[in-house]
Amino acid sequence: MSDLARTDVVLIGAGIMSATLGVLLRRLEPNWSITLIERLDAVAAESSGPWNNAGTGHSALCEMNYTPEMPDGSIDITKAVRVNEQFQVTRQFWAYAAENGILTDVRSFLNPVPHVSFVHGSRGVEYLRRRQKALAGNPLFAGTEFIESPDEFARRLPFMAAKRAFSEPVALNWAADGTDVDFGALAKQLIGYCVQNGTTALFGHEVRNLSRQSDGSWTVTMCNRRTGEKRKLNTKFVFVGAGGDTLPVLQKSGIKEVKGFAGFPIGGRFLRAGNPALTASHRAKVYGFPAPGAPPLGALHLDLRFVNGKSWLVFGPYAGWSPKFLKHGQISDLPRSIRPDNLLSVLGVGLTERRLLNYLISQLRLSEPERVSALREFAPSAIDSDWELTIAGQRVQVIRRDERNGGVLEFGTTVIGDADGSIAGLLGGSPGASTAVAIMLDVLQKCFANRYQSWLPTLKEMVPSLGVQLSNEPALFDEVWSWSTKALKLGAA
């Protein structure tokens, strides 16, 4: 074992979260030493990879689970506004990064693609009519359209209109300012900038242990997966952005804040088509309602994607299940994560989430023709041979201790950290990558409270609206939107 080395910051995981935090810290503290540790041999090889996530740029423009109908018939847009506010923070940071040479190829990861909500049936049509009215009063969603004309539907979505009888009413909410995001390509540029500016990147290294020292620092024990060599690294601050592996790594640290937390892995599968004739006839991301019992992230959607310069159509997700916490993980991941302090949490979810379990079982039983049949509800002319099944990444949803039920399953992201701010990690999946900057700013504020005020001037250069709710400041929103649109070379698709 080699001698103990020291670094100011350790980032575990080479995905979008560590990439974002790495750039923030590099700009704030250019002289700090930063070490990135990744168990695989590449950047963004797990959840941030383009084929391992939906790439919708979760800005809450089209996801209907963010705009639920209330018992009185009104539409609650609170969650949609909150998510979009976070996305605006991320968008501004990307614009700053593009202007300052951090992101040198914006189009490789960001492309304009409308975001669309799709329903059929008179009840769904009325829901979208009320949804559009509720959103139109907010500056973040002011451009959202309501469309119910079959002719206009066919003009905008020819692939979905082909062979559609229009015997029942259909409707759309159309947000022209949506984007497709390749978070893998983005993470590569961000980490590339970090490495070019002094960050050490250790690929093929797996963290085996985290131990706190008497001076409050951490010793990180890692193993080179190629040679078996073990190394130790001492650091003042650890961030765990390891996707599904974050919970097991935090458990190794022994911090009391992680006790009671558990993880529930949900896999995803998609149908994919690269036929240029198909991609030319569908230039949008179109979301439907979540199926009964499906988790919020289970709403089916038919998306235009851009990966490595090529356009694709992707439909799904179909839920899968594996005890692995990572796509490249082990089947022992789930059982090894269950400990005395979180056993009741896991059992509680097993008893209370029967609908989810039934949904997962039904998804696992789907045949190939049944998957394409679900696609034909969106695109009646879809041909089986045009589509192939692709396996996406794992999402480990948060199970939190609950006094009443033992445990509750949460579909969101949670930052867990030690009280002294020396270690933090991100649990959960959705909305995830799209809100990375807002989440990492929260990590900075919690973990570097004594420095945060001195960092604010620089942070406000990166995110001009920092600390402001743009939905309450339409003039400022228009200003930063115009600036970021120009910097990111975006416009209506």
From Swiss-Prot:
<dbReference type="Pfam" id="PF06039">
    <property type="entry name" value="Mqo"/>
</dbReference>
<keyword id="KW-0274">FAD</keyword>
<dbReference type="InterPro" id="IPR036188">
    <property type="entry name" value="FAD/NAD-bd_sf"/>
</dbReference>
<keyword id="KW-0560">Oxidoreductase</keyword>
<keyword id="KW-0285">Flavoprotein</keyword>
<dbReference type="GO" id="GO:0005737">
    <property type="term" value="C:cytoplasm"/>
</dbReference>
<protein>
    <recommendedName>
        <fullName>Probable malate:quinone oxidoreductase</fullName>
        <ecNumber>1.1.5.4</ecNumber>
    </recommendedName>
</protein>
<dbReference type="GO" id="GO:0005886">
    <property type="term" value="C:plasma membrane"/>
</dbReference>
<comment type="pathway">
    <text>Carbohydrate metabolism; tricarboxylic acid cycle; oxaloacetate from (S)-malate (quinone route): step 1/1.</text>
</comment>
<dbReference type="InterPro" id="IPR006231">
    <property type="entry name" value="MQO"/>
</dbReference>
<dbReference type="GO" id="GO:0008924">
    <property type="term" value="F:L-malate dehydrogenase (quinone) activity"/>
</dbReference>
<keyword id="KW-0816">Tricarboxylic acid cycle</keyword>
<dbReference type="GO" id="GO:0006099">
    <property type="term" value="P:tricarboxylic acid cycle"/>
</dbReference>
<comment type="similarity">
    <text>Belongs to the MQO family.</text>
</comment>
